[in-house]
Amino acid sequence: MVAISLPDGSVRSYEGPVTGRQIAEDIGPGLAKAALAVTIDGTMKDLSVPITTDASVSLITARDAAALELLRHDAAHVMAQAVQELYPGTQVTIGPAIENGFYYDFARAEPFTPEDLERIEERMREIVGRDLPIVREVWERDEAIAYFTKLGETYKAELITGLPANEDVSVYRQGDWLDLCRGPHLPSTGKLGTAFKLMKLAGAYWRGDSRNPMLQRIYGTAWPDRKQLDAYLTMLAEAEKRDHRRVGQEMDLFHLQEEAQGAVFWHPKGWTVYRTLQNYMRRRLDLAGYVEVNTPMLVDRALWEKSGHWEKFRQNMFISEAEDKLLAMKPMNCPCHIQIFKQGIKSYRDLPLRMAEFGACHRNEASGALHGLMRVRAFVQDDAHIFCTEDQIVSETQAFCDLLKSVYRDLGFTEIKVKFSDRPEVRAGSDETWDKAEAALREATDAAGLEWTLNPGEGAFYGPKLEFVLRDAIGRDWQCGTLQVDFVLPERLGADYVGEDGDKHRPVMLHRAILGTFERFMGILIENCAGRFPFWLAPVQVVVATITSDADDYARTVLAALKAKGLRAVADLRNEKINYKVREHSLAKVPVMLVVGRKEAETGGVALRRLGGQSQEVLALDEAIATLANESVAPDLRAAPQG
């Protein structure tokens, strides 16, 4: 007998092996029609897989989040079939589901065109309409290599050759077409539906290695229904308008160029925002009891070897040689912070020691992976390491979570998701230590009022971690903050403190960041507010614009008064119509314009116009300046509301 436990707590018994499809049919015709896949003891499988032993089983339908990845993976296969039907001789390589969609890499002599994408998408709809059964087959390794080699599919043959010896070689057949794949897949192509769209073309090296041939990548997106597809396409259109590279150019914030790939040229306006954000973070950390340090950018390989980074991270480090020594530009700050901790004897009374650095780091990212401010080679982290005892992990984590929530709120992000990554299979430290660390993180996030989802086995080898994900104004998620518990690095680098018992002990090291890197967070911030920064962050807060040249002297007086109150202001005295000036400064996302003419000069007033507003408010100059000076105060410096 095979006992099948279902999510509702019921148990169904079968005489022998049973498939997910049979279980669905047994439950009812509605589920039999809707079922797409099955999870067996937590692992997703095809509906056709026999279940031979007692198991916990859940049937997956289009309503389940897990179905989305399945849907997108199948879309990649249907696209590959369409390409090979339309363009014989094209080789297929790898085609996974990714966030919000899928892609497939093709080897083809002729480049694909946008018109080709339309043809491929139309053929995909035909293949869906055929409702071809998708059938899994297991082949002998030599048979599979010979088959794909004969077809001229050299990339597939290479993939099979590289599979572990104990792994099945599985292929999935859709009608006469088949592909190498681990699966799982939908029961038939018809289950994919037609809520998909091919998005763009790109180049990609085979296996991501620039020494290998360049392939053609086709990206697409797929959703359970047309409504969700349309919502996603609308979001993409809005995201294009908000693209930080586009907005950054329009607002003259920064630029990037080939001669310094992965590094940012900050213009005066962009650097103003950057420094304002950094000063805000510096004040928040100072108030939270952090000490700020600065460590060398070039560090001898010997330290990186001791820390383990040389072995695990060397390919991503920029290396320089000086006087027969190899020096690396630091990719992170943690080993250097331990060197500061080790200077002098530390007592348990010195803990927790919260050490922060706006550290300039460099990582040798592949040029193809670089993307505006979001993925760079040269960056500054809002990095800190908390040296504490095991008993202080809970309180320090809770304090960090509270600080993080407050910072995100000040910067306009109120939706925060937390991912909790627990112990991986390969790890350092005892189970007892891991139990304590994981329990401490759970307790701290609960105390901070943060809901979390589990990422099983995704912790670092040295300890569990939390990842903090922000949702922006158009519904996209961005992983920014992190907190990692580390028992290993203090041991490797010889950090210790004298405990209350007079003996030496290893501190626990909490690696933590709120923004992540300033560069990436600036990109996220620009896109979240579409360049309309909150008033306290805006690079230019006020423009004083004249209607006629008669008001030029008065405009200069207004400008001086604004600057005297610390406002970032400029005057526009050009001989242009006021509507032209309003339009130009609105496009530059300046939050406030003070319009002055002969009348305002005579009365000592200003006409205050806010960005996006259709009207203006006439105020006395002193009143306008007092209002704007109050609005320009950073959130952390504002007086707490009374009562």
Curated annotation (Swiss-Prot):
Catalytic activity line of the entry: tRNA(Thr) + L-threonine + ATP = L-threonyl-tRNA(Thr) + AMP + diphosphate + H(+)
Main location, first listed in the record: cytoplasm
Listed EC numbers: 6.1.1.3
Pfam families, alphabetized: HGTP_anticodon (PF03129), TGS (PF02824), tRNA-synt_2b (PF00587), tRNA_SAD (PF07973)
SUPFAM superfamilies: Class II aaRS ABD-related, Class II aaRS and biotin synthetases, TGS-like, ThrRS/AlaRS common domain
Subunit structure: Homodimer.
Family of this protein: Belongs to the class-II aminoacyl-tRNA synthetase family.
Function: Catalyzes the attachment of threonine to tRNA(Thr) in a two-step reaction: L-threonine is first activated by ATP to form Thr-AMP and then transferred to the acceptor end of tRNA(Thr). Also edits incorrectly charged L-seryl-tRNA(Thr).
Annotated protein name in UniProt: Threonine--tRNA ligase
Organism: Rhodospirillum rubrum (strain ATCC 11170 / ATH 1.1.1 / DSM 467 / LMG 4362 / NCIMB 8255 / S1)
Source species taxonomy: Bacteria, Pseudomonadati, Pseudomonadota, Alphaproteobacteria, Rhodospirillales
Gene this chain is encoded by: thrS
